[in-house]
């Protein structure tokens, strides 16, 4: 989860109260205090609230929670003066584009850092490390509209941010620190995305690097913001950035986006989403019957627009920067936060039952202890995944035991995983900026034929990772679990031929281990050797071993 540094001077000015009150109350909106220093506080906000990833967003939420300013924030948007056209050839590379202009911003070194931190935290929280969303922030004074979002040849040259000489896009991907880190996001394409002004000056090479011409300084007052990506999350990210800048006094201005075929979008779209919420829904989730007036009050404290239609129904307007409101349950959660969990009455169950540890928990304890003892860190990725990750990236054939999501909201979460290893490789891909070796494991759920099972899987990445290393780990794990086993030659296509083996217990295949083959490593954009194993422990749960 992102840790946001909030400087007291900025925080008190934007919130309108003292730091002691803020530090005392901010955990109640969904945050953990990490560190309290003389000049600043580090706060870890939950990943479902990217609108809190900045001092401006946190202050906006706290003003409501402290009853200093309640209800739906209103942002005036000026008519557009800037337009940008989208070319046909970019649609197969990075098809979604959101843009806005914000004028009259007064920057200091700390507010620039806050904006850049928000940008990077959104890249992580909404953007899947820039894959789904990448954000460019530009000084508008050095470029000339209208702008163009298009694809160009890899030999196209410009001066990238923090450099003084021109480089081709190919050279940027090979030599620039940002280029080498994010080159995999544009690999496989014959052309690369670019945003140009009317005089062919470069604003951005998304999702890699901006041009140096539009770098933001303390003298910058007017900004052009571009957000590119693979889906509609770009519009949410845009709304979060522009409303944060508006909280600091900036004036938002529409941008006209002209798409191929003449379709036009006028962005940002800050119109709130409207929902209907009933008192019955609230009672069913928090266990208390709150009057409609109390529900309206608490929703307004949490910065929603709310109006009672009758004694049982509330019309709720959801701010356009709230990425986490997917269901009415999310509204009820915010009502509970506003009302105060400490104020929700405890109800003692009328019947007595004796509790005991679940068999899965009894299995989890020794598994975790063994893997941690072997030097691995536990991770907990999502059970939802996609066919691409679960099968294609692993070079495995699609199976017919898959449970699919009926109406997925993301192409990354269309099915329940049938194996754990791909999720671990995704985590390695997201942590390439950290030092090696990296060793991670998970004891978690998989679903096959609508039946839930428990697997343990682990991966290790570093230049010297080999079959011997993973064999020793599997052997140690099986011995510590007091399981007699044998290994046989494996034909699992995810692993390198001759460096893979299946694990059998009592004649039944339990799992597989070995060196991941180069094609798998490449598909997850990993640059070093990876070894791993996965074992099905379902038949062992509840048994004495």
Curated annotation (Swiss-Prot):
B5 domain: residues covered: 270-346
The reaction(s) this protein catalyses: tRNA(Phe) + L-phenylalanine + ATP = L-phenylalanyl-tRNA(Phe) + AMP + diphosphate + H(+)
Gene Ontology BP term (one): phenylalanyl-tRNA aminoacylation
Name the record gives this protein: Phenylalanine--tRNA ligase beta subunit
GO terms, molecular function: ATP binding; magnesium ion binding; phenylalanine-tRNA ligase activity; RNA binding
Enzyme Commission identifier(s): 6.1.1.20
NCBIfam families, sorted: pheT_arch
Enzyme class: ligase
UniProt subcellular location: Cytoplasm
Keyword Cytoplasm: yes
Chief location bin: cytoplasm
Assembly and interaction partners: Tetramer of two alpha and two beta subunits.
Keywords tagged on the record: Aminoacyl-tRNA synthetase, ATP-binding, Cytoplasm, Ligase, Magnesium, Metal-binding, Nucleotide-binding, Protein biosynthesis
Cofactor(s) listed: Mg(2+)
Keyword rRNA-binding attributed: no
Family, as annotated: Belongs to the phenylalanyl-tRNA synthetase beta subunit family. Type 2 subfamily.
